[in-house]
């Protein structure tokens, strides 16, 4: 015990030290802030009290305390009742005992079951006379085995009873079905006071004939026929007998009980008015939608609501969309719920211009705000705003995607198109269709479609099984079936797209058993003095075989090649680094002289490969050139400017001066691609990997001119064993004619600088005539050894037949091979990828896609057996033909409002180093931009292209309402969908799907032989009587965009947008509809309540007057004829709502009118659906297909094909090659170059360009990758595979590239 105080003192010492430190710290805080700790605490408490979240939590806490007190009082009240009841029972028992004692009886506690009689088995045999036979089975214990006869009799009686019961059930069922109609007419068989959780006199909501819901009281539950009806007395007078799906609970359901597809009643706010409408839950609360529910109302509107604005439907239907009256909305909801969470939506951001449909017309509009899945669109014509669901086909990108897929389906059914994914996906700068995913799960999540039950949570429906295709023993049928099982990537490019360097996961790379002794084609690469030919097969090292995989025949042994550097498998601090560049300190002075060969005599290299493997942009500095960056002010804006100073002291400020200097001095060791005037491209910025687990200096083993290093910073996994080949290898059945007689050569002596005299340059220039406008671009091709944008018609480089110097020629780039320094690296979750080790300037050549060239049939077969991850289509012919027919438009113009981003057009030099990295807000990165959700009087819509109209249109169409209106189209406030056809076209049946409707609409709008096609072949339509087209030519927005940027621009960003001939663009006649409302707006019945539109009705009434008074450059009326009119060749007369046809002639607004033939539609439905491929293949076209100027519907012969009529078919260019019908495939799975490792990105930094080098055969271009923007060192290089989502049956590939423009899905 004596040592206890010492222990206590030792324990108290640290505490005292801590208290002293705390005191010192408090004293320091007081001295620094000038306030005491108590004042600081008080200040912090006051600030916390002011915070909204604290006040909200306190309010919630107070409510919780109130609720707890209320519950405690209720519990106490129940306890008191229980105690009182117990006391009363005790008193009652005492009274009973007293009574028994008075009677002289003895009272004892017993159970009622103990005194019950033995059970009696009753067998009822109903007959026609309703006689009941009761047989006492007797005591079970008294039965003996001797009673065999009695048992047999009982069994016979039971069997007879069952037979008679079945017979009576059949008779009763037949009689009840005959009397069912009488029961449904009002013969009430009984009234109930309770039905589940529905009790008479409870508060509920009911639906009135006006389609709005109102509060009331349940006064009766009646059994009518086989169902139940609920009689509701509304608070605002009136009674109604409603079904269970037309009443709702008067409480707000918890969030966990609601799912996508739940049937609810929600509040719709229109200004100061609030209405209750029925709808379905389209989104559950999450962070992106500010914890709100997205509701799709039955009449086509969409809106975000909170939980306190929802009421659950009492007895919803099993398929909730069947309760929607409007057919177009019903089809949309069914497709939406079935496909959820795969929701295609247009990716938008504020300020973008886009075409939006309204009343059957495409109007020029602008994105004002993006709120989750909704976007507020401002119509520039009348400044009207409207909220639209981003997945609605009223937005031009969504409509273009639907129509293109429907058109492809028609061609497949008609045998005009081979069953293959559409390699020209709708990709354009600006709005793109994005497939959102529920990334919280691991796979496809199908939402439950069971109706919301108030007692138990809904059970999800099982996934509908896919019907297997019947196996066919015929060889051709098996081959045809195998063709649809391979996926092929597409190389469609969106010019000028800006995105991140991340990529999506590619298919897993596997090690294969590769024969290393395959022969290749010799390729010439650049040498300063002579052309040196290398044979890849001679340097191919033996590849170790891998046990798994199909057996392959042994190849010839490869001769010994150069030994590869050893791989570092251990953990290193960093990869081997090279010394940094140090600029020389001495200054260069210029003395006036004439530059010649002697200016570079002192720096000419003794060895040809002195700086091989260095950054090509750094090589001029290593040869004593100086690269200086200066600042200068242009138009009150400070910009950067790059100047090169030569060894002789001459300053070079432009690429033209650099090119002239190189030719004047005869410089054959420095080339134009080694110079860059972009101030944001740094030539001495190197990327250094950190602590690799695995490192290889060169995986090409010397086959490439520049070493390709490999590093793994994730684990010790080595790269896949692939036979590296930097050139393409013809496969079985493939012959490439590389003879000089199949080439066109030039005789240039000036390095092919004069494009007008170079035959190879002229091939590139003349090929640009295959554009929609047919105009020749004299500036096409390489500009100072760089390609600023994709050239769809291809680039023709100088070849071995040319007499120009291979080293000095400005038209030789791709054939020189890899020049930039790249690295193969292991990504976190995307397999292996390629990144650059130095900055890459915009337009620079990066690499090619090399591999084995296969025929289409062999590629399909091989893709099923070994995989299709590295397939690429050589479809240059098809891409150019489609481009010529007017399907594509890469260039943003003032009329092509879909996809024009006004912010992107303002491109100039700013003071930041990487201006492209500051991305604008979009619907992905900033889903909820504004905190205050606007509930102003603007319309919201989600579904198909709906036509809403104003009071004036109803007045104009009042005279023809009885004749032109289809039956049962709903109340006047419900817009008529475009899928409902009028005026000679039968309305589609209720069984039609949305895809079939679009396909029927396309085929129904085919133009007859008397139709007119514009010079660009963008669309075909009929000439209206007296409708002459006028030339517009207004380019105000394009001019403003071109002058809004900085006056001084970098060379890499100096891109002039192409312009089409305004005369050709505006040679479009105007077509209007006669005796009908324009855009399928038939007058409606006057029944029902019109949804209040406040000031919108006035704007709608002004639409007709405004559209006729608009500028000729603002409106283009385009109307497709129906099949009956297409055959007769007649045109429609102008309607009353549109005056002169010439007053509405433009590209900015296009009117579309849909119609379909019912019989033709049924025939298409009976056809077997098109079989989809199961092979994904990249396409080597360097651009994307998109719908030009709105819808750009191409007239097809599908209508005549369906009717058995003969229609002329234009011969495809590929058929001139011995009748070939399909393109060739490049497969880089077993043999290939670094291009096989390039991953996908929805916002890539590379684009694909077809280049003709060793042959001018249009079937075999080289597939080259160019930088679409400046790329910072260490950035992963990516390109857009352009898969068409849903094109490969049974395959789904999510995209997680991380780009703002990410489309969500690849397949």
Swiss-Prot record:
Residues 913-924 have a biased composition (Acidic residues). Residues 454-467, 539-565 have a biased composition (Pro residues). Residues 611-682 form the MBD domain. Signal peptide: none annotated. Keywords: Chromatin regulator, Chromosome, Coiled coil, Isopeptide bond, Metal-binding, Methylation, Methyltransferase, Nucleus, Phosphoprotein, Repeat, Repressor, S-adenosyl-L-methionine, Transcription, Transcription regulation, Transferase, Ubl conjugation, Zinc. The pre-SET, SET and post-SET domains are all required for methyltransferase activity. The 347-amino-acid insertion in the SET domain has no effect on the catalytic activity. In the pre-SET domain, Cys residues bind 3 zinc ions that are arranged in a triangular cluster; some of these Cys residues contribute to the binding of two zinc ions within the cluster. This is Histone-lysine N-methyltransferase SETDB1. The lineage of its organism: Eukaryota, Metazoa, Chordata, Craniata, Vertebrata. The gene is Setdb1.
